[in-house]
Amino acid sequence: MNLIQKYDFQIKLMVILLSIIQPFILMSICGELWSISNYWKSPLQPMFIIVNAATSYFFFSTDRWVIPSIFLLLLTAFSLEMYPTIHNVFAGCFFLSCIYPLLTLKRFKFFGLLYLLSILVLLLVGMLWFEIYCVLILGSYHLTILIYKHNLDK
C-alpha cells in the first residue's frame, strides 16, 4: 500500500474542505471579485491552481466524476486572463457536467435538486455567488459520500 492509499480518506477530506473554504479565503484577503476565476490575477493564484488541481484529481478518482474532473483541470489550465473565451467555455462545461452525476444519484438525491437551484442564485446575486453556491453543494455532497463510505468500511 502506497502513501496515498494509506491516507486516502484524510487526503480526500482535506481536498474537500479546502475546496469549500477556498472562495471565502479568497474573498477575505482579496475582496469580492466578479467570479472565482478572477482570483487568478490575485496574489492567491497558487491557491486557486492547487485547490482546483487537487479537486480535479479527487474527482478523477470518483465514479461518474471524470468528465467534470477534466473540465475543472482545463478551466484551471486556461486562465481567464490569457484565454477568456476558452476558460469560460470550460467553466460552463464544468458546472453543467456536474448536473448529471448529481441527478442520477441513488442516495442523497436532494443534492441534485439543490444544485439545480443554483440558476436562481446566478440570476439573483451574480456569478461569484452562483459559483460559491455550486462549490458548496458539490463539496457538501462529496463530503457526505466520503463520510458515508468511510463509516461503511469500518
Which residues does each predicted region cover?
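N-terminal topogenic module of multi-pass integral membrane proteins
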Residues: M1-T62
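Residues within membrane-spanning alpha-helices of integral membrane proteins
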Residues: K12, I16, V66-S69, A91, ...
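Membrane-embedded alpha-helices of multi-pass membrane proteins, especially ion channels
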Residues: Q22-M27, F59, L72-F78, P101, ...
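Juxtamembrane "helix-exit" motif on the non-cytosolic side of transmembrane helices
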Residues: S28-E32, A77-Y83, V121-W129
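Juxtamembrane membrane-water interface segments of multi-pass membrane proteins
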Residues: M1-Q5, E32-W34, F60-D63, L80-M82, ...
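Hydrophobic cores of alpha-helical transmembrane segments in multi-pass inner/ER membrane proteins
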Residues: I20, F48-F59, F94-R107, C134-K149
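Terminal transmembrane helical module of multi-pass membrane proteins
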Residues: K109-K154
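Membrane-proximal helix-loop-helix units in multi-pass membrane proteins
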Residues: W65-L113
